[in-house]
Amino acid sequence: MIGSKVLLCYFLLSIGLVQIDAAPSDKCKTVFSSRVKDSLCGAKEYMTIQEADMDKMMDCVLRAVNIVDNTGAGNLKSLLEPMREIEVDGWKHKLNIESCTTTTMTKTLPEPQRAHAFYKCIMKTKSKKTFKEEFNKRVCGHGSAMNFFTP
C-alpha cells in the first residue's frame, strides 16, 4: 500500500517536471530553430545571426534558462555562483554582470531588448569565456546543466 503511494507520488512528480521542462523550449521554438541554436552555441564571441530576430530570441531563451530576470536584466543571483565554479574570480564576474545590468540599460531600453543587450555586453567583458561556458551548459547542453532547447 505504501509502496504504491510512493510510486504514484513519484509518477506525478515526474510528470510535473517534464511539463516544467517542456514549457521553455516550446515557447521559444518559433524564434530558436536548431540552425540558430547551432550558430549561437558555436560562437566564441558576440555575433548577429542573420536569420534570427536577436531581441526576441535572446529575450525568450535567456529568460527560459534564468540568465536574465523577469525584467530582462542580467540575473546576478542565478549567474554568479555557477560562474565562480567555472572560474574562481568572483569579483570580476560580479562587476561585469552588474555593469551589464546598469540602471541605464534596464530603464532606458524597452524590456524586449534588454536580454539581448545584456548578452551583447557580457560577451564583450573579461567574463566572456566563463559566461559563455555557463550559457552553453544551460542553453546548448554542453556540460552538466539541463538543456531546455533540444531541437
Regions found by a protein language model. Name each.
Residues 3-22:
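Cleavable N-terminal signal peptides of Sec/SRP-targeted secreted and luminal proteins
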Residues 21-151:
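Mature soluble extracellular domains of secreted precursor proteins
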